[in-house]
């Protein structure tokens, strides 16, 4: 019976420890690659996309991604947290109905070149909502203060 020995399988100037070191770095690189975020943030190039990305991600329960599409200030973040809390306060069936609902955009009103108002509803609750979408250096983002404030 033939026995295999590491010294017969490897060239004279390469040690088993060197190969194990290479394997260790390969596995480390693969691990770090897998840990990197796989979801890419898609910048909203227009107000319709900004509003739609926010609404879709909110309805799907993906609040981490939906948060990327709001104007980040203290009041907006507080309103956003309330929206997420209300969503997770629903039972499993209620959340599923929202996830399956479709978005119906009723009207888009361009106030000026940097502000647009989107009037929409979803097929689940059929309640009309308005979003103010603002052009920012990081794309078009939703200002929740308009939706939940006295400006309506």
Regions found by a protein language model. Give the residues of each.
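Intrinsic disorder/low-complexity segments
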Residues: 1-2
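Short, Lys/Arg-enriched N-terminal segments with co-localized hydrophobic residues
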Residues: 8-17
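Sec-dependent signal peptide recognition
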Residues: 21-28
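Short solvent-exposed beta->alpha transition segments
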Residues: 43, 48-49, 53, 58-111
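Exposed beta-sheet edge and beta->alpha loop/turn motif
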Residues: 100-152
């Amino acid at each position: 019976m033939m026995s295999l020995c590491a010294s017969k399988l490897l060239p004279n100037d390469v040690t088993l420890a060197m190969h194990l070191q290479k394997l260790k770095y390969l596995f480390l690189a693969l691990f770090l690659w897998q840990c990197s975020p796989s979801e890419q943030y898609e910048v909203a190039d227009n107000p319709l996309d900004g509003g739609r990305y926010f609404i879709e991600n909110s309805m799907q329960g993906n609040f981490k991604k939906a948060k990327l599409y709001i104007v980040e200030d203290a009041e907006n973040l507080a309103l956003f947290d309330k929206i997420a809390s209300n969503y997770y306060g629903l039972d499993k069936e209620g959340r599923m109905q929202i996830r399956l609902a479709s978005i119906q955009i009723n009207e888009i009103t361009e106030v000026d070149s940097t502000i647009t108002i989107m009037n929409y509803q979803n097929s689940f609750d059929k309640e009309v909502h308005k979003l103010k979408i603002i052009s920012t250096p990081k794309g078009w983002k939703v200002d929740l203060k308009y939706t939940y404030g006295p400006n309506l």
